[in-house]
Amino acid sequence: MAYASLATGVLLAAGYGSRFDPAGLHNKLLARMPDGGIVAHEAAHRLLLVVSHVLAVVRPGSEALAHVLNEAGCDVVFSSDAERGMGASLAAGIDASADSEGWIVALADMPRIAVATVEAVARTLDGGASIVVPFYQGQRGHPVGFGPEHLDALRELDGDTGARALLATHRVTRLDLDDPGILRDVDTPEDLRGM
């Protein structure tokens, strides 16, 4: 680990992935990428190279995914409210790490974010920024950093919009980076083949 952030990583892994497999038989986060890596494991690994403590939030019944994330080095939080959406899952991760110096929130279906991007977000957050957001060619991506002053607002999140309202109503430090991985997620089998 070249840089060790003071923040806690929150890896959101509680979605249903219905576009990847409408029948719900295969969890996209457990799918193998063309290089053989597992989607969620790779996303966790990249976060853990910068953030020493990562909480992965999964939904109940995702024991195989929890095992993979534990093996990657994450602590796992089961969110009983995961069906209510990303906001509820994020709130569960924040609640489980309320004493943190800040949070770097990443999505488990985004395995190609450059480690340098995670480090840039972490350094900016650790340097005192309130909210840090990476951009690539004008588009907002992940991971997003939140300072400790947002604890209460993050704990109250619910629904499927995640923390978008916080981004819209608070000062955001924008990082323009050359990393298309901040926008690339695995929503379909075609996305996976393109990784």
Regions found by a protein language model. Name each.
Residues 81-148, 152-155:
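Conserved beta-loop-beta/alpha segment of the NTase-like Rossmann-fold superfamily
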Residues 34, 77-81, 175-177:
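Short beta->alpha connector loops at strand-helix junctions that form conserved
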Residues 29, 75, 130, 171-173, ...:
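Conserved beta-strand segments of alpha/beta enzyme cores
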Residues 2-59, 63:
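N-terminal glycine-rich phosphate-binding loop and ensuing alpha1 helix
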Residues 42, 64, 88-92, 120, ...:
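Alpha-helical elements of Rossmann-like donor-binding domains used by nucleotide-donor carbohydrate transfer enzymes
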Residues 52-92:
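Short, surface-exposed acidic-centric catalytic microdomains
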